[in-house]
């Protein structure tokens, strides 16, 4: 035990001193904070007027999050207006890195869903705080904010604390998502110009496997022609639903081989998946969505999905867990507390479960962004990672998609073998497996599921820092 604790301490020291060289919706549907508890929640803070009028210091000062018992990291939060016509606003919460914040890369985190709040990533996965059942705030052992400046945005409009006053303010495709995010990012870096010079990475998991390539491609396209440039260096995608057609085509075999379907159930699953793919090829997007929803997701159906009926499980994020862990929803009650809402400047705004967001993105659900991802892989650093125990976007399904990708390194990728990754040379346990081709890194993390940093916090922490700080995948020596 003592030796293990020393390894953790050494890893943190290494990070400071080594130079750099919706669809998946069930977990979010249980997280609904319709109204705050009674009390003074203050008023929502809209920062775009301060940005437009050049009142940057005042905007920064007003957006600073007030101290709350257990929450002592310096942070900023508020709303950025991305469409004045429809009064569409994206909520953000920004944490400068604990170490060397002036130079640390800025990392945007986007949750999946569609319609999952990035507050889930903050409180459940890799932010500085954990919420207990009695609303106590604890410090996370391996927060990504230790070495990275983390920007959490509730995306798209209508997700979490983000909102719009008009139905036309909702995104109906990834172009809409990217356009709103780009507006928010440009305004964010104008509000915090001291961070605009830092390297910028876009990260996310699950359905954000669409959001991340979409906004990255948008930045890639606009940077050459815009005066204000975002210093995009790379992206990281966890268990990413980037390429639905290819992923859906592998479900029946995968679920059968891990023992979740019998032979008859596999035949039904395969038949329905083929029907879904047929609709995708015919661009019958709504029909494809309905087939997949009845088969697997059960988000908008009257009863359980076929998957839920035959497995008895509602959780397809970890093969070892039939239901979602209870502690993954504690933060929702915390965000109802008026003193918390006042501290993060959201006032009495509803915290949405994202059902409306998914409704407007139903056709987008089965569309691919693979061409955008391939373009990003040609020019930027890219990390694609999977938890070994994930079901909904299993490692085998990600690899199935990657084998069909057309990018500059595709020939080399298909002929490159994965290598063993350990954090420390003396570790008995293997952290995972890595396949690297140039600036592209594919990682499978052992012992983790879809919500990877929750299942494997240290391995996720080590992985993201190795990738962003270009430290390679050789084990550290004690």
Curated annotation (Swiss-Prot):
Annotated keywords: Carboxypeptidase, Glycoprotein, Hydrolase, Protease, Signal, Zymogen
Glycan-linked positions: 83, 134, 309, 350
Biological process annotations from GO: proteolysis
Catalytic machinery residues: 206, 390, 450
InterPro entries for the chain: AB_hydrolase_fold, Peptidase_S10, Ser_caboxypep_ser_AS
Pfam family, one: Peptidase_S10
The EC number(s) this enzyme carries: 3.4.16.-
Signal peptide: 1-22
Gene Ontology molecular function: serine-type carboxypeptidase activity
Family: Belongs to the peptidase S10 family.
Biological role: May be involved in the digestion of phagocytosed particles in the lysosome, participation in an inflammatory protease cascade, and trimming of peptides for antigen presentation.
The protein's name: Probable serine carboxypeptidase CPVL
Source organism per UniProt: Rattus norvegicus
Gene coding for it: CPVL
């Amino acid at each position: 035990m003592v030796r293990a604790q020393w390894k953790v301490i050494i890893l943190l020291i290494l990070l400071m001193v080594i130079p750099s060289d919706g669809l998946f919706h069930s977990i979010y549907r249980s997280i609904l904070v319709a109204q705050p508890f009674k009390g003074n929640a203050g008023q929502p803070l809209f920062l775009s007027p301060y940005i437009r009028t050049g009142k940057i210091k005042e905007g920064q000062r007003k957006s600073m999050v007030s101290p709350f018992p257990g929450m002592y990291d310096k942070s900023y939060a508020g709303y950025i207006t991305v469409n004045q016509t429809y009064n569409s606003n994206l909520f953000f919460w920004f944490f400068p890195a604990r170490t060397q914040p002036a130079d640390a890369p800025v990392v945007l985190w986007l949750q999946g869903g569609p319609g999952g709040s990035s507050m889930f990533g903050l409180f459940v996965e890799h932010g500085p705080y954990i919420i207990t059942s009695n609303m106590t705030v604890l410090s996370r052992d391996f927060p990504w904010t230790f070495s990275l400046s983390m920007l959490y945005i509730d995306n798209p409009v209508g997700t979490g604390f983000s909102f719009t006053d008009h139905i036309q303010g909702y995104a109906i495709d990834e172009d809409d998502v990217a356009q709103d995010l780009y507006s928010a990012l440009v305004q964010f870096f104008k509000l915090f110009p001291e961070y605009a010079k830092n390297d910028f990475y876009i990260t996310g998991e699950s359905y954000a496997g669409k959001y991340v390539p979409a906004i990255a491609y948008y930045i890639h396209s606009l940077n050459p022609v815009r005066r204000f440039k975002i210093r995009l260096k790379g992206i990281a995608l966890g268990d990413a639903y980037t390429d639905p057609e290819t992923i859906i085509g592998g479900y029946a075999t995968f679920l059968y081989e891990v023992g979740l379907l019998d032979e008859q159930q596999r035949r039904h699953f395969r038949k329905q998946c083929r029907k879904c793919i047929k609709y995708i090829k015919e661009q019958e997007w709504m029909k494809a969505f309905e087939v997949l929803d009845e088969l697997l997701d059960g988000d908008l159906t009257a009863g359980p999905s076929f998957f839920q009926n035959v497995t008895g499980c509602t959780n397809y994020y970890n093969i070892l867990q039939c239901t979602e862990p209870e502690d993954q929803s504690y933060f929702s009650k915390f965000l109802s507390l008026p003193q918390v809402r006042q501290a993060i400047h959201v006032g009495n705004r509803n915290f949405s479960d994202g059902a409306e967001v998914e409704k407007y993105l139903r056709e987008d659900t089965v569309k691919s962004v693979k061409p955008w991802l391939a373009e990003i892989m040609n020019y930027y650093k890219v990390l694609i990672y999977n938890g070994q125990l994930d079901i909904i976007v299993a490692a085998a399904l990600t690899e199935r998609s990657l084998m069909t990708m057309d990018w500059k390194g595709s020939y080399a990728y298909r002929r490159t073998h994965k290598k063993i990754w350990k954090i420390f040379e003396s570790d008995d346990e293997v952290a995972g497996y890595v396949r690297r081709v140039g600036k592209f890194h594919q990682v499978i993390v052992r012992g983790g599921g879809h919500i990877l940093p929750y299942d494997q916090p240290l391995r996720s922490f080590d992985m993201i820092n190795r990738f962003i700080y270009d430290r390679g995948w050789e084990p550290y020596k004690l």
